[in-house]
Structure formats: structure tokens, C-alpha cells
Regions:
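Active-site-adjacent segment of SDR/Rossmann-fold oxidoreductases
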Residues: 110, 127, 148-158
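Active-site helix of classical SDR
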Residues: 103, 138
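Rossmann-fold scaffold of SDR-type NAD(P)-dependent oxidoreductases
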Residues: 66-74, 95, 119, 161
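Canonical Rossmann dinucleotide-binding motif of NAD(H)/NADP(H)-dependent dehydrogenases/reductases
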Residues: 1-17
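C-terminal helical subdomain
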Residues: 162-163, 181-203
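Catalytic Tyr-X3-Lys loop
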Residues: 75, 82-101, 118, 142
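Residue(s) in the substrate-gating loop at a strand-loop-helix junction
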Residues: 122
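Conserved mid-core segment of classical short-chain dehydrogenase/reductases
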Residues: 54, 76-90, 131-134, 173
């Protein structure tokens, strides 16, 4: 299971009501069955669909004040620079576009006050990796957006936190084992302890 699951699970254990967003309806059905309705609400859709974002955030806000937004979406694309095609670029850019749309809508419904926004990115936002040019470009874009938010809301009750984890041992690499072998993947950090560290610094 991934970092998003661990974050949701640990927040629920702490008594939070978590709204989870995913395009995978089957996975959301499993989570809805696992957790009670007063702990977890599932939203199924494309994080880059503006209408879906607006409708979902409005519904979430109707449940109460949004205290924390965690932007954790992202898909990898690991190739040599000349192998990238438009579809690869679009896939990587979904994470950046989704981050922006969910952040903007959340800030609006919160009146730009009393909210924490956690942007979970990657060490790929801090350097260039030979076979991750488009992925790194997306993550650098997320970093630039996050730093701009931090500048815009400095000294206010809007707190924007940047998180740059390295490799995590999850299914994130399931289609990339030609680049990151399963053996190497299993040397990466586990999502549970990472989620603990992130939440310790957020709540």
C-alpha cells in the first residue's frame, strides 16, 4: 500500500475525517468498506477535471472547515530524453495541474485562512536525473508553485509545507522495473514510517 493510504489511515486513527480522491473506483470501494462514513469519504474522478475539483471541494467544505490539504498525486515516467512522447508529458503534468487546481479551490473555500497545505513532491524536484527529464521538470514545476505560495502567504494563517521524499517501497514503480528493479525498490523507505514523520510535522 502507498503513502496516501498510510496518511489517510493514520489521520483516521487520530480521529480525523478524511476525504480521499482517486480515479480508481474499485480501490475507493475497498476503502469505503474498510472505514466508517464518519471517518472517510471517497471522491472518484480525475484530479485535473476542474468541474470535479470544484464540486468535490464544495461537498467536502459542507462537512466542516477544511483544516489540511495533502497533494500527493503523481505518476512516474522514466525514459531516456529522446524517448518521451506527448502522452508521457501529459501523464506527468497531471500531478502539477491537479496540485494547482485543488490548492486554488481549497484556498477559496477556506477564505485564504486557517488551512495547512502539504505538497508531497520528490527529490526529483531538487535535482536532475538522467532518465527522468520530464518527471523532474514536473516536480520542479511543483516546487516553483509551492515556493510561490509560501511567499504569497508568508505571515498568514495559511501554512504551505514542502515535502521532498526519496524513493518509497510501493507500487509506484510497478511499470518501471526496467529502470528501478524490484530488489532496489525494496531497499527504499517504507510508507508507514514516512507518513508518521510527515504527520508529526503537520498536526
Amino acid at each position: 500500500l502507498g503513502l496516501g493510504y498510510e496518511l489517510a489511515s493514520q489521520l483516521i486513527d487520530k480521529g480525523w475525517l478524511v476525504a480521499g480522491i482517486d480515479f480508481n473506483a474499485e480501490r475507493q470501494a475497498e476503502l469505503t468498506a474498510q472505514w466508517p462514513a464518519d471517518s472517510y469519504r471517497a471522491y472518484i474522478g480525475d484530479i485535473t477535471d476542474e468541474a470535479f475539483v470544484k464540486e468535490s471541494v464544495a461537498d467536502i467544505a459542507s462537512l466542516g472547515h477544511i483544516d489540511l490539504l495533502i497533494n500527493n498525486a503523481g505518476q512516474p515516467s522514466f525514459k531516456v530524453p529522446t524517448a518521451y512522447e506527448a502522452a508521457d508529458v501529459d501523464k506527468c503534468l497531471k500531478g502539477l495541474k491537479g496540485m494547482i487546481l485543488w490548492t486554488v479551490e481549497t484556498l477559496q473555500v477556506c477564505g485564504e485562512r486557517d488551512v495547512k497545505i502539504a505538497q508531497i513532491m520528490s527529490t526529483a524536484a531538487t535535482r536532475g536525473n538522467a532518465n527522468e527529464s520530464v518527471y523532474c521538470a514536473t516536480k520542479w514545476g511543483e516546487k516553483g508553485y509551492t515556493k510561490s505560495l509560501q511567499a504569497a502567504y508568508k505571515g498568514t494563517s495559511v501554512k504551505v509545507v514542502a515535502i521532498y521524499p526519496g524513493g518509497i517501497d510501493t507500487a509506484f514503480y510497478r511499470d518501471s522495473h526496467d529502470y528501478v528493479s524490484e530488489d532496489k525498490q525494496h531497499t527504499f523507505m517504507q510508507p508507514g514510517p514516512l507518513a508518521e514523520v510527515i504527520l508529526f510535522n503537520l498536526i
